[in-house]
Amino acid sequence: MCSSDLLHEFFGNIYEEVYSNSIDKTAEYIRTLDEYTPGSFERYNELSQIQGQTKIPRARLMIEELLADNTTMINLLNDCFDAAEAEDQQGIANFIAERLDAHAKHGWMLKSFLKDQRA
């Protein structure tokens, strides 16, 4: 079983990687297309395909839900990659490819945690 300190550090690393490496860049790429990002938390939630948690789940369920959300994110990124390539937006496609690599890594790490918890 993974210690809570190890999981806390792991989740913190994912949080830092996602928020440090994607949020601002995503917004900047959206602006290069003369579009605007959602301007409020409510609008962001309306558009989101990933739902937040209202309770604090046990560690295993937390990992399972994060893995499912990560898979959703990979599917969305694949759709975005295809759209960027179809519109000949190579810079955006490259950025999305980097995000896909990062989420693939998150996925195998989450699966590894789940496998280790079965032992």
Label each region the model flagged.
Residues 25, 94-119:
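Short, contiguous alpha-helical
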Residues 1-3:
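Short, small-residue-biased leader/transition segments that mark boundaries at the very start
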Residues 24, 28-29, 38, 42-98:
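Acidic/histidine-rich alpha-helical segments that form the ligand environment
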